[in-house]
Amino acid sequence: MSASSITGDFQDFLKHGLPAIAPAPGSETPHSPKLEEKHREKRAGLPDRHRRPIPARSRLVMLPKVETEASGLVRSHGEQGQMPENMQVSQFKMVNYSYDEDLEELCPVCGDKVSGYHYGLLTCESCKGFFKRTVQNQKRYTCIENQNCQIDKTQRKRCPYCRFKKCIDVGMKLEAVRADRMRGGRNKFGPMYKRDRALKQQKKALIRANGLKLEAMSQVIQAMPSDLTSAIQNIHSASKGLPLSHVALPPTDYDRSPFVTSPISMTMPPHGSLHGYQPYGHFPNRAIKSEYPDPYSSSPESMMGYSYMDGYQTSSPASIPHLILELLKCEPDEPQVQAKIMAYLQQEQNNRNRQEKLSAFGLLCKMADQTLFSIVEWARSSIFFRELKVDDQMKLLQNCWSELLILDHIYRQVAHGKEGTIFLVTGEHVDYSSIISNTEVAFNNLLSLAQELVVRLRSLQFDQREFVCLKFLVLFSSDVKNLENFQLVEGVQEQVNAALLDYTLCNYPQQTEKFGQLLLRLPEIRAISKQAEDYLYYKHVNGDVPYNNLLIEMLHAKRA
């Protein structure tokens, strides 16, 4: 199969979709003019609704670029591939984060430079004094206009009525002003100030860090046996006795190329674009609430049952950045994906003789292949991605398809896995020891690396909001070359990074390093995906994986 035919099929797939994937059922930030000028060029490629002034805080972090030295396998289609005896995972380095020094806070009332915490939040000296005098002297103002006068640094004294109203609206607290006209506020607000200050310091400390360094990883893949001699115990139960009544559409047809589409193509429900989305400076100019939640009371918990959307609303909406809420809307209907894959496996088994069962590796490949179809459909229907031209979409997906598969598998284990088992996309728990005892050393090494990463992410309390952020960071990689709309890709990456940083600091304040630790997992995911690609190619050239599946199409497209 030529690279050109693969590319042509993939283009058609991205344009028209697949009939096999069912549609889901019904589903004023102050800024500096100088800073606006600084970022205007970088935002030139963004659609109009995304061309909002991006303050320094929205560009705090850029995804660390990973330098890899892929140790690929030199083979042709006709060769019987031999895995090197020792295939070394290359070292990974992470570059420093870029950082804008302009972190100056602005008064939420008038936009002047803040001087400290006054009566509930950060304000300037002028508004602090005005608010104090108004409350202590019990002044009553009137507005000669329509009670909506503009309040800024140049005309904050023109209408005291609207100025005081704005003080209240942004969160300045009447009860914080002392009635005895003595200096100082009420002591009960001290803990709030300390907590808010600590959050800001954590945020700045993460940004000012010299960068995160990933220690060199070295995992050796031993020589592989020539074939898979045993089956995994219990895994065939995934293709037996599966109910079909709830499956809306037939599964993917493997009698033809997975890229060929029918005239009736799938249409995804539109998700509203982020018209009201404000770039992320989540902490600055935010009113300090009188009560703060326990550090983990609003944190997402492990979700029971098989649906990534379970527990999605456990956190207060105010603690989840708007962008992350929009990313969550793009998530696929997991029960539907599960049902479709199970139906496909049953159909595959029914098409075979009763004595002829799928091999364990073949069954896993078909699960991964169908999962990859759902991942591509997720990308095609996602915000930002659907605004790219097909050529850019192809380049991004061809770059990261294996990483998205690995990340999907790992999150499934974090959210739904049980001790000593592997949780499959079909909803089946398979005994881990049975897999280890019945598969090749190289496959076991891959599985072991993935399980180690699962343990680390569980210890970090990895949740669904962070999962969707990592998915977008993997998909919108600025490492991809020759993109026509690189500005959009880079802009999405930076905005998702900023939203993820705000989310982790708001919801996990005691885990001060969580944001950095999550980013450190990305090169580890890439390392595992590289090994998985090499292993898949090895199995393919030895005839263990057929040509007519999406996994191999993507593998050849990436290596072309």
Swiss-Prot record:
Coiled-coil stretches noted in the UniProt entry, renumbered to this chain: none
Basic and acidic residues bias locations: 31-48
Zinc finger extent (NR C4-type): 107-127, 143-162
NR LBD domain location: 319-558
Region (AF-2): 547-558
Keywords, comma-separated and alphabetical: Activator, Chromosome, Developmental protein, DNA-binding, Isopeptide bond, Lipid-binding, Metal-binding, Nucleus, Receptor, Transcription, Transcription regulation, Ubl conjugation, Zinc, Zinc-finger
Signal peptide: none
Matches recorded under CDD domains: NR_DBD_Lrh-1_like, NR_LBD_Lrh-1
Chain residues that bind Zn(2+) 1: 107, 110, 124, 127
Annotated localization: Nucleus; Chromosome
Domain of life assignment: Eukaryota
Region (Disordered) location: 17-54
Keyword DNA-binding included in the entry's annotation: yes
Binding site for Zn(2+) 2: 143, 149, 159, 162
Described function: Orphan nuclear receptor that binds DNA as a monomer to the 5'-TCAAGGCCA-3' sequence and controls expression of target genes: regulates key biological processes, such as early embryonic development, cholesterol and bile acid synthesis pathways, as well as liver and pancreas morphogenesis. Ligand-binding causes conformational change which causes recruitment of coactivators, promoting target gene activation.
Name of protein: Nuclear receptor subfamily 5 group A member 2
Taxonomic source organism: Rattus norvegicus
Gene: Nr5a2
